[in-house]
Regions:
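Metallocofactor- and cofactor-centric catalytic cores in central/energy metabolism, strongly enriched
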Residues: 1-400, 407-410, 415-486
Length: 486
């Protein structure tokens, strides 16, 4: 590599030893940021994680602080790629671990047993919330884990792709195994017509999913809604947890508010878990396609076959075309918080981001709104936006989401959203946000030891222990939109 990452703040003039070289720091350098190991001429590629993260904007000296002011991305437009398959043997034994989940009629397993109200259109959000309040007051949630309405602004005034995205995500929520029962709540006149929407659910369990079209109710829609919810509650409260194999777990992999520690602590930790889960017969999903730019060839060459490689090429280039069609550069992703935390370019971010999926082969590629069909590691088309991407992961069928963060974030999607801190300061400062601390990895804890604790924590959450977002009541959905609003 061309750089090293500072594990603590360094002052100008301090001396460090790297691979037998004595390096004097030329500037004050914050923790998580990069220092140059050797002189680099203007235009020279700067390597981190063994790959280029950009090139020097000017001549750089040994010991110089490398950041967005002197490092420029190499990313531009779409590319042509060649399939050069790489196979890694994980050598991880199947431990036959189990968790206690809710087994549904179709064989899927939930980690929660909740009652959900799903509006087909934003016009009925208020009614949905009122119904949830009434059912909570009446039942005290006895015998179930929670009652929620999933507000959104869509379902009408949308065309083509946006309209289908909304319908697919709402369908996926209705069919999610974490829901013991669902009330689909419609206005009646929306573009997302209720009868057509219900057909999208396929052969669904009519005792567990019911429809209320409020414009067709003569009189009080709340009274009619409560009648249906009481029927749904009577079904859901009888569900009990059963011992099932961890192979039934489907886990989403996400990062947000990343910093310079993300790629050396939390993301590799999540990657180790992902490999372990895949070895147990389980499933993990990586998304945030724009945050794969610069690391995409690593994923492409891990595809199990040429067909999956071709799908991954489309996954990447289609998102690049989306950026370019709006006149936006493909490499301007890092946020102000990313840069303040030590991430300078999109390649820098991507090479850290993709470590969340470990080394397992890619066994499936999903479009936005698709539901999981293949066990193992899957890639999913969705943007990097935290709320949109996390919702997409859960919609694909993930029962929980692992979310690494260096800056911190409180939000959660409609499934448990576990926050893993990249550094111990965040873990200490925001215990109400953070579920697990990966910062121990730069404080002497061995990866193999922390992975065992991490596996136990995830299984505890799958068994019913609340993630911090659940405890705080921070749960919401966000649907991808890229077209015209009428």
């Amino acid at each position: 590599d061309s750089v090293v990452v500072c594990l603590r703040p360094f002052k100008q003039g301090e001396i460090i030893e790297v691979d037998g070289k004595t390096i004097t720091l030329l500037q004050d350098t914050p923790a998580g940021h990069k220092v140059l190991i050797d002189n680099a001429a203007e235009g020279t590629n700067i390597l981190k994680y063994g790959y280029p993260i950009g090139h020097a904007k000017k001549d750089l000296k040994q010991g110089e602080w490398v950041n967005e002011n002197n490092l420029k991305t190499n990313l531009a437009g779409t590319l042509e790629y060649t399939y050069n398959p790489v196979e890694e043997i994980l050598n991880i034994e199947n431990e036959n671990r189990t968790f206690k989940g809710y087994v549904r009629k179709n064989g899927e397993v939930g980690v929660r047993n909740e009652i959900w109200v799903v509006p087909t259109v934003g016009c009925v959000n208020g009614i949905a919330e009122k119904l949830v309040d009434l059912l909570k007051q009446e039942t005290k949630c006895e015998g179930i884990d929670a009652i929620h309405a999933w507000h959104h602004n869509f379902g009408c005034s949308q065309l083509s792709g946006d309209h289908e995205n909304t319908r697919k995500v709402l369908r996926d929520i209705c069919l999610h195994p974490n829901a013991g029962a669902v009330l689909v709540l419609s206005l009646g006149c929306e573009n997302n017509q209720p009868d057509e929407f219900m057909k999208m659910l396929g052969d669904y369990d009519k005792d567990r999913i019911k429809l209320l079209v409020t414009q067709k109710v003569e009189g009080d829609e709340l009274e009619e809604g409560m009648k249906l919810l009481r029927e749904l509650y009577a079904q859901a409260k009888e569900d009990k947890r059963q011992e099932v194999s961890v192979s039934k777990l489907r886990v989403g992999l996400k990062c947000g508010g990343s910093d310079g520690f993300s790629g050396i602590t939390a993301n590799p930790l999540v990657g180790e878990f992902s490999d372990w889960l895949v070895a147990q017969g389980g499933t993990s999903i990586l998304t945030e396609v724009p945050e794969m730019f610069g690391a995409e060839t690593i994923l492409m060459n891990r595809c199990e076959n040429k067909e999956l490689f071709d799908k991954t090429v489309h996954l990447i280039n289609d998102f690049k075309e989306y950026f370019l069609s709006h006149g936006e550069p493909v490499g301007e992703n890092p946020s102000p918080g990313n840069k303040a935390g030590g991430i300078s370019t999109l390649e820098d971010k991507a090479l850290g981001c993709t470590q969340k999926c470990g080394r397992a082969p890619v066994s499936g590629v999903l479009q936005y709104g698709d539901r999981l069909e293949t066990t193992g590691l899957n890639l999913l088309s969705a943007p990097g936006n935290d709320l949109v991407a996390s919702t997409a992961l859960a919609s694909a069928g993930c029962q929980l989401v692992l979310f690494t963060t260096g800056r911190g974030t409180p939000f959660g999607t409609f499934v448990p959203t576990m926050k893993i801190s990249t550094n111990s300061n965040l873990y200490r400062n925001k215990p109400n946000w953070i579920d697990f601390n990966a910062g121990e990895l730069v404080e002497g804890t061995e990866m193999k030891d922390l992975v065992r604790k991490f596996i136990d924590k995830i299984i505890a959450v799958a068994n019913g222990e609340e993630a911090r977002n659940e405890y705080n009541g921070y749960r919401e959905i966000s649907i991808f939109k890229n077209g015209v609003t009428l």
